Amino acid sequence: MRDEPFTVDIDVRYNDVDLLGHVNNALYSTYLEAARVEYLPEVLRTTEALDSVLAHLEIDFERPITLEDDVEVAIWVTDVGNSTIRFAYEVRASGEVAATAETVQVVYDTETQEPRPVPDEWRERIEAFEGL
């Protein structure tokens, strides 16, 4: 893994916060998606990678996020499979880890609506970027 992961700043919106005064748990997956949507075109230099579909999502919550927190999501790839890309995340609130997460994206052919192999070029770019 790189010394410093790719990070994305997240703006916590007023409507993200529930009656308990913290970001609703369902919004964390939206924050993860926002990080992926910035990471994939940046690293792979194509928006075609955004056609992948979510196959697995796991989130462990460490502390609440409030409207006052400065939030960022750190994202990195831990594995590139035949047709999958496994991501790890840290959701950070004012410098503290608020949640950790993992997703698995399946590279998807939008015409056939079937999984397809990770292109060699993507694999090479991810491995070079992440130091895998």
Where are these regions (language model features)?
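Acidic side chains
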Residues: 16-18, 60, 69
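ABC ATPase A-loop
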Residues: 52, 66, 70
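HotDog/MaoC-like acyl-thioester-processing domains
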Residues: 3, 61, 66-67, 78-132
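Hydrophobic residues positioned within well-ordered beta-strands of beta-sheet architectures
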Residues: 6-10, 55-57, 73, 87, ...
